Amino acid sequence: MKIENKLKEMGLELPTATPAPAGRAGAVQVGNILFVGGHTPGSAHQGKLGDDFTVEQGYEAARQACLNCLADIKATIGDLDNVKQVVKLFCMVNCTPDFGQQPQVANGATDLLSELYGDSGAHARSAVGMSALPNGASIEIEMILEIN
């Protein structure tokens, strides 16, 4: 089944890719590797985990940030079915110093990629806490993909 059809079946909508500021790109292809720059979940998810958001809300924010990554992936390579393997996911979590559940938050993105791509969605991952992220975002995600 096509990835975009899976998204619809899951009740999820692929957002429109947001143009990157001048001099940058949302994603850059080098050979068969696609580097996806940092994506946040949007203005509805501004704040800190451990203070403004629960782990469950962070999970949903990571899922939304991943959807925003997928929008730029589609804009760059034309079709989400051209992803051969998700190689690496880097999830940055804006959190309080005592918050230690970054992996559980990052699972929002990991689970989505697994649901969409199956074994090809399995990836190496880092989930780290940050004292701040751009524009107060709760989550920022970067990805590296192998494409067909």
Where are the regions a protein language model picked out?
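Short, polar/acidic, helix-capping and beta-turn segments at strand->helix junctions
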Residues: 1-148
